[in-house]
Amino acid sequence: MRRASLHSERDEGALTAVIEFLSAFTLFLMILTAFLSLAQLQMGSNDPAVDRLDRAASLGLDRLTSGEGWFVPMDEGLDYTNSTADWHLASADALHEGRVQPGLMLHHKLDMHRISALHNVTEDGMAAGLGLDDDMSLHLSIRVLESDDPQRVGLSLFDGGTERGTAPSSSTAYRSFQQDGERYSVVLEVHDGGRKNNILEITEVMVRPSSSGPEWIEIHNPNDFAIALRGWSLNHTSGSVSSNLLLQSGVISGQSLSLLTGDPSSQVVGNASHVLDLGALGFLGVGQIDGLSDGRGLLSLRYTQLDEITPADVVRVEWGVEGLFLVAGQSLVWEGNDRFSSSSWSLE
């Protein structure tokens, strides 16, 4: 009996020691938690700005890949009564004027029609729809990681937006999808600021049209996102005479061609997706009315960043110089090299 009593006393002592240890450890955790709260320390990155980007990237990707999305058109204000989930059927101009939250899903799968329609959305329009702050920018990429068709492995379905290297800090959210024998990745990067990758290319210019046709300028958007023309301008110089046009409206879809023309009614559209009338604005001519010089001239496409006041040349086209003397019906065609050198242009 005495031996049993000794065992019982030892067990009670051990239990008491364990309880005292747990109580002390719990008290320690409470003190540590209170200290961290008072010191306003944050676990994880210890940087509120980075945490803010992390939340924005995570929420943005969730909104992008959790549903069909929505579009609210503009009609003297946002027309909520005619809002729709079929945002992918709206034009680039309509999407830019209204409010869109692109969603990529249909019946719980990635919808290729919606992915293709991202070319009609501007980066700023997507950022606003996903709820990003005004000082944030984004980059979105969608790729085929695995496929039953080896030729589709690594295929880029969309890759556009502000490059990470132009921003001081960034955060990335990633999601993969397995469907129809393929695996896709959707990667959303959210940046603190950054310089927009706004590049447009003048690919062909008609200075001396034949048969009383209109002057025209063909512009290509090599980006996957659409680009709004607000902030873009054109400058034409011939001798001591110069004319400028600040573009106030219009959107060019990603990976598409647009025509700026002196007369839309007589313009041959070809494979252009958009036609903008610059004849009514007096910049391009038609018939006997010249907007661009028939002799020697210089045309510049310019862009002004939102935080700058001076426009920067993006493309320059010069004619009436060696090898580039035009006759009626000939156009200047860019060969795809230097956007500022006359040697990159030929006659067609």
Positions of predicted regions on the chain:
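N-terminal single-pass transmembrane signal-anchor helix
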Residues: 2, 8-39
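Active-site-proximal beta-strand/loop segments in catalytic clefts of secreted hydrolases
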Residues: 191, 205, 237-238, 260-264, ...
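A structural motif detector for short, solvent-exposed N-terminal "entry" segments of globular domains
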Residues: 194-239, 289-294, 311-326
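Conserved beta-structured recognition patch
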Residues: 281-348
